């Protein structure tokens, strides 16, 4: 391994989301992003889930793929995208959520089931979950 005993930072100063989606998402997520910006966090979005996750894993941050008006259940596939990265995140001290539930607790109902997806530094994901559930 290139990084033995890897640990994801509990907090970060990076948020990763396609901000082109902002007209179509929950206003609470917009509030969260504004909060991140006020605290000095920077936006970093490559457009590759794995590359974006890897950067946040090393430096600390959160990746957001919320549901939109067009994709009411999100776009990330639960079984072969979200679960794999959620497992890795939890092994290094991070967290993954659909905004309500821990990703690894979601019982799949279909092979290609999609889910909203929030993954990264534990404190950032917890804060977003609190905002989404308030």
Protein language model regions, located:
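IMPase-like, lithium-sensitive Mg2+-dependent phosphomonoesterase catalytic core
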Residues: 1-134
